[in-house]
C-alpha cells in the first residue's frame, strides 16, 4: 500500500517542489493551499483549494492518518512585505491560526510525523548586527529578540510543535529555512526573496542601465537552492532529531555582490544604485554544524550554480510577461 503524505502550502514555492519529490518517491500526495501554483501544474494526486485558517476546512482535508504531514503554509514574503510593519497583524494572526488548526487536527487523527517549516528570521537581532560575523547557531535563539513579527510567530510555532511532542507523544520535526530560492518561486510583487528580486531587476534592465538595491548593499545573507532544501527537509522529517535545526548554506554574500553575480550571469553591463529601503538584519548566515553532525548533510553546489538556474527561469518569465503585455 502506498504511503500517504499531506503538504500544506502545496501551491507555494517550496511546497510545490516538495509535492513533486514525494510523488517521485512513490507517495500518494494531497496538496492544500489557497491557490494552485501559478507557474506549474501540481503533481499532487489530490489538491484541495481552501483556507487553513478555517478549522472546519482543516478537519475536512486531514480526514485520515497520513504517514507524513508537511506544514509549510504561512503568511510570508520578502523584506518589502515583512519589514514595513504594515502587515504585522496579518502575518502573526494568519500563520499562528494555520499552525494551531493543522497541529490540532493531526493530533486528533493520531498523526505522529509532522514537519514544520520555521525560518532563520526567528534568530535574535542582536546576534546579527555584524555583517561579517552573524551568529545563527541553533542554541543562540534565546534570549529571543527577532527583528520582525514574522520571526516572533515562527518562534512561537516552533514551541507549539515541540510542546505537542512533549505532552502528546507526537514526532514533530522543525527545520529553520535560510533564504530558499530557485525556479517556480515568486519573482515580483513584493513577496519575492533577494535572489529572485536581483534576477528580475537584471533581466528587465537594458544593457548599460542601472538597478536599485535597498540599503548600502553591505548587509549579508546566505541562500540555499530549492533542490538542496527539499533533500534536507526529507532527511530531517525521517530522522530522530527532536530539536529545531538549520537548513541553509554557509556561503555568505553581501547583497551588492549578489546583485553583481546576477549581472555577471546576464552578460550585461549594469550599474548598481543603493537607495533607502527595508533591509532587515545586517548579517545572517546558516550555521550547519548540527545538520552536518547529525545527518552528514551539506549543500552540494555553490550559490553561483543555483543563481544561474534561477536567472534563466526568471529571465524567461520576464520575456513571457512582456509578450503578454504587447
Language-model-derived ranges and their functions:
Residues 126-135, 159-237, 250-252, 259-266:
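NAD(P)-dependent short-chain dehydrogenase/reductase
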Residues 43-54:
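Rossmann-fold cofactor-recognition segment
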Residues 100-147:
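Conserved Rossmann-fold NAD(P)-dependent oxidoreductase catalytic core, especially the SDR/UDP-sugar
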Residues 52-95, 108:
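NAD(P)H-binding glycine-rich loop region in Rossmannoid oxidoreductase-like domains
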Residues 27-36:
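Conserved glycine-rich Rossmann-like NAD(P)H-binding loop of the short-chain dehydrogenase/reductase
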Residues 204-326:
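C-terminal substrate-binding subdomain of Rossmann-fold SDR/epimerase-dehydratase oxidoreductases
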Residues 5-25:
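N-terminal Rossmann NAD(P)H-binding glycine-rich loop of SDR-like oxidoreductase domains
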Residues 149, 153:
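Active-site helix of classical SDR
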